[in-house]
């Protein structure tokens, strides 16, 4: 954190470190350490731009261009610079200027290797007065090309997410078409940003523009905004027969951005792409239809009436505030709280499974502490109460864990977690029940009681001359005795567990029926006593 004195000193120096010979230039504000795949905020450089006296308290408009490397992002940004400088100096409509003038600004060149690393902003912040009379600060942002040979998916996701989180207009620069993998990458990157912002229930980002470069099908969809919007509507359309994953991608994009647009831009010309000597002069190489569409695209993005201030949580952000958000966001991505992105499908599944496993472990550990292996028998009512308490604790942990995929995607994993917790609870109940002394000796007690009762009944019936009934009781005594001996052997040897389970179930059924009959008789006797009536057996006398 910069002290007030240091902040003032940094701001008073302006963007001197980023300028050569007193001229504005690009300033590196997020540095990528490619070997360590880590990120560093150049706080001094960022402060030198955003804390200049004349703009620090103005609401800021941040226009960012992001996308795959070597697709002309810096090239487009330099035309934006030309437009802004033209409006600053004289404001006439011919902002493209002298056709003999080379294109300067953000570093760009033809070739196959990326030119920009990390995130850069232009050192001069433009002040623009909107039609309503409000003055705003306009910042242009350039990003590292995604998916170069040295960048991991996490590198790309972090850079794209940071630029999207801090910009009011994110231009997604694509080549030739909007492919399905472009949408999936966008879903992954924006979800990575939404995780860091803790935005779940509202749209965390503002404007997304798909800028499709080198559009080759003007006979299907015209160049420009109108053709682009028609093309985008078709590409992002959600249909019933589509696979769930494809539907989720489209729903996710609409849920993340308040406004989504598309602009189709023609190829600038073959010589622009192939000539090593091209320096951006409009007179040379650049196709007329490309220049024509540029004169529509750039004013559409930067016209004072179109400028949209950066908002976070519904509040407009000043240049001073943007610096603080940069510092807060970079700390999140430097930490270990966020999941490591792989692909959207892998990341969401693995991340949610990990969160569910962690929550399940919390429940299991908590229950083990009160009714685990060596813990004494616990009352079923207390066990149920603790189950509900620890279940809620586990669910709260799952909900609070940062997860990819959004609330709807995570809900199915929450349901699975609840089912697994229920299974664990049933196992804990069985284990707890086995600790009950009466439960342990329930089966032999029932069998022994049955043997004793039947033996006495056999003697009585034999005494009064009912030999057949007495022999029947004796047979039943023999069967119960065999069952008792068998149960004891099974308990001792651990064999024939199914037969032992059947004997236990039979004993439990007999005990349940006897208890139910005694309970009903007792309740009836109590009711009769309260009502002042004689018991049913006395009535019959």
UniProtKB/Swiss-Prot annotation:
It is found in: Endoplasmic reticulum membrane. The keyword Disulfide bond does not apply. GO terms for molecular function: GTP binding; GTPase activity; GTPase-dependent fusogenic activity; identical protein binding. The keyword Chaperone does not apply. It holds the Pfam family GBP. Residues 1-25 are annotated as: N-terminal hypervariable region (HVR). Residues 467 are lumenal. The chain crosses the membrane at residues 446-466, 468-488. Keywords: Acetylation, Endoplasmic reticulum, GTP-binding, Hydrolase, Magnesium, Membrane, Metal-binding, Nucleotide-binding, Transmembrane, Transmembrane helix. GO terms for cellular component: endoplasmic reticulum tubular network; endoplasmic reticulum tubular network membrane; membrane. Residues 1-22 are annotated as: Disordered. SUPFAM superfamilies: Interferon-induced guanylate-binding protein 1 (GBP1), C-terminal domain (SSF48340), P-loop containing nucleoside triphosphate hydrolases (SSF52540). It is a multi-pass membrane protein. Residues 1-445, 489-541 are cytoplasmic. GDP binds at residues 70-75, 109, 213-214, 272, 275. Atlastin-3 (ATL3) is a membrane-anchored GTPase that mediates the GTP-dependent fusion of endoplasmic reticulum (ER) membranes, maintaining the continuous ER network. It facilitates the formation of three-way junctions where ER tubules intersect. Two atlastin-3 on neighboring ER tubules bind GTP and form loose homodimers through the GB1/RHD3-type G domains and 3HB regions. Upon GTP hydrolysis, the 3HB regions tighten, pulling the membranes together to drive their fusion. After fusion, the homodimer disassembles upon release of inorganic phosphate (Pi). Monomeric and homodimeric. The homodimer, transiently formed by two molecules on opposing membranes, is the active form mediating ER membrane fusion. Interacts with ZFYVE27; both proteins are involved in endoplasmic reticulum tubular network organization. Interacts with REEP5; both proteins are involved in endoplasmic reticulum tubular network organization. Belongs to the TRAFAC class dynamin-like GTPase superfamily. GB1/RHD3 GTPase family. GB1 subfamily. This is Atlastin-3. The lineage of its organism: Eukaryota, Metazoa, Chordata, Craniata, Vertebrata. The gene is Atl3.
């Amino acid at each position: 954190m910069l002290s007030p004195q240091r902040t003032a000193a940094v701001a008073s120096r302006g963007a001197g470190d980023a300028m050569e010979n007193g001229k504005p230039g690009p300033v590196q504000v997020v540095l990528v350490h490619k070997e360590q795949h880590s990120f560093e905020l150049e706080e001094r450089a960022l402060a030198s731009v955003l804390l200049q006296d004349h703009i620090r308290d103005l609401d800021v408009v941040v226009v960012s261009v992001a996308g795959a490397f070597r697709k002309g992002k810096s090239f487009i940004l330099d035309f934006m610079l030309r437009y802004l400088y033209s409006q600053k100096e004289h404001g006439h409509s011919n902002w493209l200027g002298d056709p003999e003038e080379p294109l300067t600004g953000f570093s760009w060149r033809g070739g196959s290797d990326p030119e920009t690393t990390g995130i850069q902003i232009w050192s001069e912040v433009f002040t623009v007065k909107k039609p309503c009379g409000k003055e705003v600060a306009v910042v242009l942002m350039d990003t590292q090309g995604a998916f170069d040979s040295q960048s991991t998916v996490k590198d790309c996701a972090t850079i794209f997410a940071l630029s999207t989180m801090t910009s009011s207009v994110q231009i997604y620069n694509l080549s030739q078409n909007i492919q399905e993998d472009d949408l999936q990458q966008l879903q992954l990157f924006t979800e990575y940003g939404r995780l860091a912002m803790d935005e779940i229930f509202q749209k965390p980002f503002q404007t997304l523009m798909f800028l499709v470069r080198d559009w080759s099908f003007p006979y299907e969809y015209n160049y420009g905004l109108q053709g682009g919007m028609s093309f985008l509507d078709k590409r992002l359309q959600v249909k019933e027969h589509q696979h769930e994953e494809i539907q989720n991608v489209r729903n996710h994009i609409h849920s993340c951005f308040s406004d989504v647009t598309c602009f189709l831009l023609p190829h600038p010309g073959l010589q622009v792409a192939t000539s090593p000597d091209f320096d951006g002069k409009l007179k040379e190489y650049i196709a007329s239809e490309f220049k024509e569409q540029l004169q529509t695209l750039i004013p559409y993005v930067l016209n004072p009436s179109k400028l949209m201030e950066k908002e976070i949580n519904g509040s407009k952000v000043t240049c001073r505030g943007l610096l603080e958000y940069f510092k807060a966001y970079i700390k999140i991505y430097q930490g270990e709280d966020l999941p490591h992105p792989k692909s959207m499908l892998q990341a969401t599944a693995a991340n949610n499974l990990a969160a569910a496993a962690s929550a399940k472990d919390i429940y299991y550990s908590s229950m083990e502490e009160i009714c685990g292996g060596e813990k004494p028998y616990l009352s079923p009512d207390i066990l149920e109460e603790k189950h509900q308490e620890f279940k809620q604790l586990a669910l709260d942990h799952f909900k609070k864990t940062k997860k990819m995929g959004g609330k709807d995607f995570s809900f199915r994993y929450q349901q699975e977690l609840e089912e697994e917790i229920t299974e664990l609870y049933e196992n804990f109940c069985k284990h707890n029940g086995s600790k009950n002394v009466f439960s342990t000796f329930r089966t032999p007690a029932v069998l022994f009681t049955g043997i004793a009762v039947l033996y006495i009944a056999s003697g009585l019936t034999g005494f009064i001359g009912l030999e057949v009934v007495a022999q029947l009781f004796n047979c039943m005594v023999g069967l119960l005795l065999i069952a008792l001996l068998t149960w004891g052997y099974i308990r001792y040897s651990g064999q024939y567990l199914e037969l032992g389970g059947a004997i236990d179930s039979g004993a439990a059924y007999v005990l349940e029926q006897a208890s139910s009959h005694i309970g009903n008789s007792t309740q009836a006797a109590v009711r009769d006593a309260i009502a002042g009536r004689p018991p049913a057996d006395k009535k019959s006398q």
